[in-house]
């Protein structure tokens, strides 16, 4: 786990896995809220870093893990009781798959989302020696060095969008980091990317992927994704101009 001012859901997140974890490895990127005291309450000594890069920090956490099986968890995620039971069962087995794909149950302002790109699965549980971390600052993920994986049915509960202020702050950070990543790769922005991509993002999530079925309470979320696209490519355009 990587933390940085993550006190809002950190206690619930760690509590959800403490009974199945032989060790909990946390890299903290300079928290100034209650994060460190919460970690201390679980007798967790985080690895301190000044680097605010999710991919590199998660790679550091993975390198410090010693168990055969690793679960990658974010501080706004809570492992469901049914997934806990599944993991306990897996740990008792002698023959394991190299990786396990886990479904996510995403929430916006406390309400469950079922459509519009919010009903997906991710690799989060794997043999330690069979995975590495995608080294990017945004949307980092586990990468399995094998084709031997299994889909699980029990979910991780994800509370990424808790308030509008928190959500738009996260999207702003993501967009600026993503623009930097794209700039480093030599990508050029364009009028089409700045104008059309945000509109397409909004339409794809709300209409094409049937986000409207969740109810129009999710409208600020889909507008937020459009905003993130706009900010990414407009920031990239500014970086291109400064060359």
What does each model-identified segment do?
Residues 23-26, 149:
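Hydrophobic/aromatic residues located in beta-strands of well-ordered beta-sheets
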Residues 22, 36-64:
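Conserved donor nucleotide-binding strand/loop of the catalytic core
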Residues 9-11, 33-42, 82-83:
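Acidic helix N-cap motif at the loop->helix transition within catalytic regions
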Residues 1-20:
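Short, well-formed alpha-helical segments that are part of the catalytic scaffolds
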Residues 10-14, 32, 56-59:
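A generic local structural motif
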